[in-house]
Amino acid sequence: MSQKRIHQIERRIDRIKTALLEIGPMRPGSLTRQYKDPQYHAGAYWQISYTRRMKSRTEYVRREWVKDLRRQIASHKRFKSLVEQWIDLSIEHSQLTMQVADPKVT
């Protein structure tokens, strides 16, 4: 059973690696619409906020770039999700490999 699970994990890791190769431009952050006068929703503008290397930043975004930035943010979220899955699977793979090599140890 463990050997079978190890092979499943290896196949899943290979699929994750392939998916990572297909990720295009990416950028962390959240894109929000702000208003100069929030009560009347007047003076709308876009901004992106993100934290990188423990430093928080906020930048204004032109309307024509909103669509591209949404794609880049989605790519970054996908990247982070895939990396997390890879790490979880790698830990499980390591544990199973050690159990198969020495079944006496739990």
Residue map of PLM features:
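A positively charged, amphipathic N-terminal helix/segment that binds anionic biomolecules
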Residues: M1-T106
